Structure formats: C-alpha cells, structure tokens
C-alpha cells in the first residue's frame, strides 16, 4: 500500500514506479498551524496578516499620497506652482519698474547736463561781450528805483543788459526785453522773474537797433509788446 504522504510504494523493487511527492506548501509562522496539543494563539490584528502572500492574504494597506493631476510632486504642488508664478510675475514687474526709474533718472541727468552746458555757453558769450575791446556802456535809472546798464560791442554785434534792484513782476507775468529797431520792437529775450539782479545776453544781433525797452508780458513772453514799457534805454554811440 503506498504511503499516504509521498504516494510511493513500500517496497524497493526495481520494477516499481517511483513518483515524486508533491511538496507541501511553504507556510510562514503566522500561517502554520500550531503543533498538536499547544494552546491556540490569540488572533492577530488584520494589519499583522501575512506579509509574504503565501496564504492568499493581502499585504497591509499602505496609505497612498495624493498627487496633483499632472503627477509631479506631492499634494499641494499646484498651489506651490501658482505662488511661484505670482512671485515670478512680481519680480518681472519690479524689474520693469526699476528699469523705468533708471531710464527716467538717466533722462533727468541728461537734461541737467544739457542745461548746464547751455548756461556755460551763455556765460562764455556774455563774458566775450563784456570783455570786448570795443564794448561801450550806458546806464539809466529804471522804474521803482532799479538801475540798469547796457553794454554793446559792435565787433561781437551783441548786447548785454545788467539790472539791479528790479522789483518782481506781477504773478504770472515776466519782464521781456525788446530791441528798438527805429521804432519797431524786436524781442530780445526774457528776464528771470525771481532775480532782482540779473545779467541778460540779449537774443539776436544788435544790427541797426538804437536802443532797448522792457515791458511786462504774460508768462512765456509775447510776439510783440502788449503793455507800455517800464524802461527805455538808448544804446551808447561813442
């Protein structure tokens, strides 16, 4: 009679057919039945079930981390991405604003340099007239107790007006100087409304002008006099 465990004959006859016994299933300690006569082990919690899968029991449930829809990074990556985009946009805006401020500052500095260069050239031309060998002067008392002096150089064909003690013009008005071309008034520039003492290089050549006058005009000046002169002076002839 064959063995009930390995299904092999009891004899050792060479004519017997040997068959390999089916190996018993391997069982882990938690799945292996207890030896006869031993106390039954206390039931274990479900999470402590077989970890090898030998008895068909599933592995303990592992909590899964949720991932964003795009599958990149841990949960909340979308929110982080939005904050990153906002921060990047703020940096770009700040850089653009800084660039605009830098351009404005550069323009202001350039304008200041141009004004300084223009004032320097104006002072140089004024000095050339005052120091010219043929420069002639004429002085006169002006309205309100002010004093005026005009300097003319025929070689430079230019004239300079020096004022001291000039009262300020009315609000919104300026003093405008005119060449007197045989009765026709030709604009020769504006005086500084904030300066009581001023030196003005008259705009344009003297040519045939015989004198000059000063009127009160709207801010920015006028193409021709709009008020009576507050001062009239003749140019020196000798």
Curated annotation (Swiss-Prot):
Renumbered residue ranges of the record's region Disordered: 1-51, 214-238
Top-level taxon: Bacteria
Entry-linked InterPro entries: Anti-sigma-K/W_factor (IPR051474), RskA_C (IPR018764)
Signal peptide range in chain numbering: none
Gene Ontology MF terms: sigma factor antagonist activity
Entry's Gene Ontology BP terms: regulation of translation
An annotated GO cellular component: plasma membrane
Sequence ranges of Low complexity compositional bias: 16-31
PANTHER family: ANTI-SIGMA-K FACTOR RSKA
Protein name listed in UniProt: Uncharacterized protein in phr 5'region
Source species of the chain: Streptomyces griseus
